[in-house]
Regions:
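Compositionally biased, intrinsically disordered low-complexity regions enriched in proline and serine
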Residues: 103, 171-174, 254, 276
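Conserved alpha-helical "signature site"
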Residues: 1-145, 149-157, 166, 173-247
Length: 284
């Protein structure tokens, strides 16, 4: 990966995810973790504690009785919603920006990543090999973090890029980013994941979500799941502005998932229902 001094400086200056959020991401990606581990982490962060209790008592979740402790909240919400809540606490910092370079309004990146995560997890249930659905979900949330770093550098280019794709100058939006900047949002997202010291599977899912066929065997099912989740999210209208549906689907997903074309509308319907519930619970 060859990134300019300017972009490396931007990455180094990017505020890190809180230690609390990083610990939650690491723990929930393990096969053998306990509820008490998550409780201890959440209870150390007053903002996250307040958000978890708010979400667990929201109208969208509708608990049968008030949830008054973190232990109750985490038992009731489950890992997926805890990851959502943890990352939503830093959404303003990374996901909730207006992406000027993509002509994408404030908040759209977060909603796209949320829909991608939900769709990717649904897709992962059809994997031909075992795959950790918690890792798939979190990778879906994180896959486009590079956009928040490079967006300002692409300001005013979207019309040129879309025209270039229509005129077959570029095969997709990623190629155009590389032509204009010398790198793309996937490479920058990977660099950010390395800077944050995220586990390798998140790094590769971020780097290869538009080119999953380039993944090593160990990471291929994860990268393809996020790739498909991203495509389904855009098909459902949850994109990030000018690059929406400006990428090809990698047909090699058939090597990793038992999915037919007839499954797609059903996946989108299930994902959209869950997406609306989560969005309401998180107050986005």
């Amino acid at each position: 990966m060859s990134l300019s001094k300017e972009i490396l400086k931007k990455i180094k200056e990017t505020s890190p995810l809180s230690q609390c959020v990083l610990q939650i991401l690491r723990i929930t990606s393990k096969e053998d973790y306990s509820l008490s581990e998550i409780v201890k982490i959440v209870e150390c962060d007053s903002v996250l504690t307040a958000n978890v209790l708010r979400v667990s008592n929201s109208a969208a979740i509708s608990p049968a009785r008030p949830i008054i402790s973190i232990n109750m909240a985490i038992s009731y919400l489950g890992e997926k919603m805890i990851v959502n809540t943890a990352l939503s606490t830093c959404a303003n910092q990374f996901f909730n920006k207006k992406l000027e370079g993509y002509e994408s309004p404030k908040g759209e990146l977060w909603l796209h990543c949320l829909m991608t995560a939900i769709a990717a997890k649904i897709v992962s249930k059809n994997s031909k090999t075992p795959i950790n659905s918690n890792i798939v979900y979190t990778a879906g949330i994180l896959h486009d973090i590079g956009k928040s770093v490079i967006s300002s550098m692409l300001s005013g280019t979207s019309e040129k890029i879309v025209s270039g794709i229509l005129e077959h100058k570029y095969s997709n939006y990623l190629e155009a980013e590389r032509d204009i900047l010398g790198f793309d949002h996937c490479e920058v997202g990977e660099a950010l994941a390395i800077h944050w010291k995220l586990p390798d599977y998140y790094r590769y899912a971020i780097k290869l979500h538009h080119a999953p066929s380039g993944a090593e065997a160990e990471f291929a099912p994860l990268c393809f799941a996020v790739h498909l989740g991203d495509i389904l999210s855009m098909m459902n209208g949850a994109g990030t502005g000018s690059d929406c549906l400006q990428y090809e689907i990698c047909k090699e997903y058939e090597n990793y998932f038992d999915i037919s074309g007839n499954d797609i509308p059903n996946f989108i319907m299930i994902a959209d229902n869950e997406y609306n519930i989560v969005k309401e619970a998180l107050n986005f």
